[in-house]
Amino acid sequence: MIEVRLFAGLRQGRQKIYQMETDSIKTVQDIMDTLDIQRSEVNILLINGFHQKPETPVNDEDVVSLFPAVGGG
């Protein structure tokens, strides 16, 4: 199982945490497609705490964290 954690605005209309089977999920992009999250919505993408790209492969027991761009001033 892969644990997917969504933060801030990415949670809107979605769960905070997902558990996904690795059968159909091969990359972070597959996760984003499954959750209907566009690349432009994600500013920081971590796998097990390390910065990665959407095309990075995922493995069983990985923790994927997706963060949107954060604004403020």
List PLM regions with ranges.
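Ubiquitin-like/PB1-type beta-grasp interaction modules and other compact soluble beta-rich domains
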Residues: 1-72
